[in-house]
């Protein structure tokens, strides 16, 4: 399934979850992991889960580390470079 059709919706959900659960990090991580496991593209799912594991996201207790990890992941995968998030303009959540 082509992520150009559903990808932006998943990214919106990911960033909503991070901001909504910034004070409940365990719930946040659980939701993020489940979303990545449910990605309709097998390659995207594998890539996301490998990146989560490689960067120790599930063992992190720092919401900003998780937030900036997902921003970086998004920027590395975005189809249109104009849609990249300028990391210099992003403020920490807490």
UniProtKB/Swiss-Prot annotation:
<keyword id="KW-0285">Flavoprotein</keyword>
<keyword id="KW-0560">Oxidoreductase</keyword>
<dbReference type="Pfam" id="PF04805">
    <property type="entry name" value="Pox_E10"/>
</dbReference>
<dbReference type="InterPro" id="IPR036774">
    <property type="entry name" value="ERV/ALR_sulphydryl_oxid_sf"/>
</dbReference>
<comment type="function">
    <text>FAD-dependent sulfhydryl oxidase that catalyzes disulfide bond formation.</text>
</comment>
<feature type="disulfide bond" description="Redox-active">
    <location>
        <begin position="41"/>
        <end position="44"/>
    </location>
</feature>
<comment type="similarity">
    <text>Belongs to the poxviruses E10 family.</text>
</comment>
<dbReference type="GO" id="GO:0016972">
    <property type="term" value="F:thiol oxidase activity"/>
</dbReference>
<dbReference type="InterPro" id="IPR017905">
    <property type="entry name" value="ERV/ALR_sulphydryl_oxidase"/>
</dbReference>
<keyword id="KW-1015">Disulfide bond</keyword>
<keyword id="KW-0274">FAD</keyword>
<feature type="domain" description="ERV/ALR sulfhydryl oxidase">
    <location>
        <begin position="1"/>
        <end position="94"/>
    </location>
</feature>
<protein>
    <recommendedName>
        <fullName>Probable FAD-linked sulfhydryl oxidase FPV093</fullName>
        <ecNumber>1.8.3.2</ecNumber>
    </recommendedName>
</protein>
<dbReference type="InterPro" id="IPR006890">
    <property type="entry name" value="Sulphydryl_Oase_FAD-link_ERV1"/>
</dbReference>
């Amino acid at each position: 399934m082509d992520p150009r059709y559903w990808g932006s919706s998943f990214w919106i959900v990911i960033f909503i979850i991070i901001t909504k659960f910034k004070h409940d990090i365990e719930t946040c991580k659980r939701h993020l992991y489940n979303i990545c496991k449910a990605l309709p593209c097998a390659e995207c799912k594998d890539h996301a889960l490998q990146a989560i594991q490689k960067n120790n996201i599930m063992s992190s207790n720092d919401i900003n580390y998780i937030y900036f990890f997902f921003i970086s992941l998004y920027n590395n995968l975005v189809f249109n470079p104009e849609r990249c998030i300028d990391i210099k303009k992003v403020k920490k959540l807490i």
